[in-house]
Amino acid sequence: SHEALGAKFVNFSGWEMPIHYGSQINEHNCVRNDAGVFDVSHMNIFDFHGPQTQEFMRYVLTNDVNKIKDYQALYSLITNNEGGIIDDLIVYKFNNDKFRVVSNCSTFDDVKNFFKLNIEKFDCEFSHKPNLGILAIQGPNSEATLSKVLDFPLYRYINSFSFLYLYSPSLPACAYEGDLFISRTGYTGEDGFEVIGDHQKLQKIWDLCISENIAPIGLGARDTLRIEAGMNLNGTDMSIKNNPFESNLGWVVDFSDIERDFIAKENLTEIKESNKHKLVGVLLDEKGVLRGGQKIIKNSFEGEVTS
C-alpha cells in the first residue's frame, strides 16, 4: 500500500518507514489544516493484567495512574534508579487490573527488560503484542474523517486522552471479527486519534482512509509536526543521560501523593531542586535551518540544538 502511494522509505530503528509520499511540506500542512493518516505500527504495545497491576503502574511510572479513571490515558516516563529517562510512553487504563502501554520502537529491549525486572514483586503479568499495529489519524478534521470511515459517531463517546473499544456490530464500514482500540491521542499537536488492531483490520481502515482522500503522512512530517508542537523525541531530545526536569518533562513526575513510592523518587526529588539544565524551544528570526548538534551561544552560556 505504501509503495503504491509513492512512499520513499528510510530505515528507522530496524523498520523500513515511509519518510514521505512525495512532499513532506504538503503532508505537514495537510495535518495542520485538514487530516492525515500515519502508519505507526513500529511502536511497541504491552498489555498488563493481574490484581496488582495498578500498584505496579504506580511504582514504575513517574506519573500517577491514580489520577485517571477507567478508559482514560496518561503520558508518563520510565526512568532508571538514578532518574535517567529510559523512555516516554502513554499508559491506558481499562480498570485497576488491566492496563496497556505504548512505547517507542527504538527502546524495545530496554523497556521490556525494565518491566520484566520490576514486575517480579507484583501479582501482575505482561506481554508484548507484535500482532497489533497502530494507525494515527491526525488533524483538525480527524474526528469527522474517522467517524465517517468507521461509520461511528466518535464525538459522542471519546474525549481527549481517553479511549474505547469498538466491536464489529458498531462498525459496518469495516467488516472484521474482533475488536478495535481507539484513543484520542497523538504526536502532532493537533486533535487526533490512534487506532490499534491486528494488521488485517488496520489494512481495511487504511484503505478506507485513502479512498476518502485522507492524505498518507510519512515520518518526515511526523517529526516536523511534533517539533512544531514542542514534543520530545526520545534518543534525540532526551536519553538515559537526561533527567525529566532538564528535558522539560518535570510535569510528568507526580510527587503529590507523599505515600506513593516509585522508582528514583528520592533522586528525582533532589534533582528537581538542583537541576541547572533545561530543554527550551528556539525560534529562528532569519531564514535558515537549525540542525541537531549545532551550538547556540549567548553571553557566557552555550547550548546545543537537539531537534
Segment roles from a protein language model:
Residues 1-13, 17-19, 25, 93-307:
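Conserved, structured C-terminal
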Residues 1-79, 84, 220:
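Acidic, proline/glycine-enriched N-terminal capping motif
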Residues 88-90:
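Short, surface-exposed charged micro-motifs
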